[in-house]
Amino acid sequence: NKRKNKIEQTIDGQEFCTGDYIPFHFYARMPMLFNIQKGYGVTQVHAEDIVYLIVSIDAIINEPSREYIFSDAHAISKIAKFYGPQHITEIDHLLDIDSIKSFQWSDDYIKKERKQAEFLIKGDIPVDYIEMMCCYSQKVKEKLIGMGAKMRIVVSPKMAYY
């Protein structure tokens, strides 16, 4: 795993290890998901076996003891810059929102890396921070409910999956 022991710095000089943080993306249909669903360079996982967890950033940033960092590109990318909590109010200006929301990225390396900007959260995430789940089919939704999922579950095969 390339990120497990990778040491980085925020633009303000705070050192951290990317492997100590749980990465979340800001939108759907990431290049990594494409590779996982197609089996490019990794073990193939079918869409029915992938569930998105949608986490409340507000809950995280409003918890004083919660450590988080965000990047403006994929965390292992050479072009990524990292920002600490003091920059959270600037997030809309620091991230390339058009690239993040784009579904066309294969012919543009920079767009592909910027699409994969990350919100990195240190430590475990309380289950009540999960606002909803997104899954591929009604069958998967029913399975999640059967497993005890209490949060909102959205079925979104075209928006969220390849």
What feature does the model see in each segment?
Residues 1-162:
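Active-site-proximal loop/hinge segments that shape catalytic or ion-binding/gating pockets
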